């Protein structure tokens, strides 16, 4: 709440040339909120309204005033939608798999990985991210864990975040030496004994059919990741377009419009 009030207050003070939050009038607050309605989600807009509402105390220009709720014009993410699985569905699918495939399913969901990227998982210190890209500092905002990297389409190496407890389980499956595997005509160095590629995808589909009665393929966990991250970022008051850009990079793309494909 304090962060939201600071952000809103600074923007209003700069726009109207006032020096104190106490000078913010109801008209200034309403104007600010209406302007924000086109760029942030409903939860973020409600947070800023509640923050500004704190200024209705004695001694403030907004004393006794109640700010009405304003509806956002920005894109709202309905979760889950399209090909996305819910977290409970992912858990059910993983519970029906053998341990090496179950861990792969959980990691793919937690980090938004493609099936072949599971082969390429490495600690970031051993496989640095591609340096020719400008990576957003907002990646993984609001989440904690251990940074790994994977090699995606076009050879792009990107950072991914894996929850610490999951990373500990992954490290327990580290191979003494990497093995070379071939999948769909491409050779990979694999450093962990976890499921990946076509074999993991087949295991995922079979487990999904047994547990939830349907599947959208393993790529659905990337859709779930994208939708979860958009919801998290918008709830943290990231503007819609900025959230699209952040999630795009987390998925290994650099086009915000690609993220919207995962939201359908």
Each model region followed by its residue ranges:
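Flexible interdomain linker/hinge and immediately adjacent N-terminus
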Residues: 30, 61-91
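Active-site/catalytic core of tyrosine-dependent DNA strand-transfer enzymes
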Residues: 161-227
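Catalytic-site neighborhood detector that most strongly recognizes the C-terminal catalytic loop/helix
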Residues: 249-264
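Basic, Lys/Arg- and aromatic-enriched nucleic-acid-binding interface segment
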Residues: 87-116, 241
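Short basic/aromatic active-site micro-motif
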Residues: 201, 213-234, 240-249, 253
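Conserved tyrosine-mediated DNA breakage-rejoining catalytic core shared by Y-recombinases
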Residues: 121-169
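The alpha-helix within a helix-turn-helix
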Residues: 108, 119, 247-249
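Non-catalytic DNA-binding core/recognition domains of DNA-processing enzymes
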Residues: 1-63
């Amino acid at each position: 709440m304090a962060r939201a009030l600071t952000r809103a207050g600074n923007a209003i003070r700069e726009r109207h040339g006032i020096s104190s939050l106490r000078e913010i009038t109801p008209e200034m607050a309403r104007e600010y909120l209406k302007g924000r309605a086109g760029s942030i989600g409903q939860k973020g807009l409600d947070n800023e309204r509640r923050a500004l509402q704190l200024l209705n105390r004695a001694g403030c220009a907004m004393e006794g005033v109640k700010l009405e709720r304003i509806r956002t014009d920005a894109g709202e993410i309905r979760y889950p939608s399209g090909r996305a699985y819910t977290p409970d569905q992912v858990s059910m699918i993983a519970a029906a798999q053998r341990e090496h495939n179950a861990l792969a399913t959980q990691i793919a969901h937690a980090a938004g990985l493609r099936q072949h990227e599971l082969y390429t998982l490495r600690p970031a210190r051993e496989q640095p991210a591609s340096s020719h890209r400008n990576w957003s500092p907002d990646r993984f905002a609001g989440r904690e864990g251990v940074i790994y990297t994977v090699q995606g389409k076009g050879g792009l190496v990107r950072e991914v975040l894996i929850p610490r407890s999951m990373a500990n389980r992954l490290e327990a499956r580290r191979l003494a030496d990497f093995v070379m595997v071939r999948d769909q005509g491409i050779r990979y160095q694999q450093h962990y004994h976890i499921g990946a590629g076509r074999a993991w995808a087949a295991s995922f589909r079979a487990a999904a059919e047994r547990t939830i009665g349907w599947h959208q393929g393993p790529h659905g966990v990337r859709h779930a990741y994208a939708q979860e991250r958009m919801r998290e970022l918008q709830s943290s008051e990231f503007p819609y377009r900025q959230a699209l850009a952040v999630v795009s990079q987390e998925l290994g793309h650099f086009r915000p419009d690609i993220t919207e494909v995962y939201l359908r």
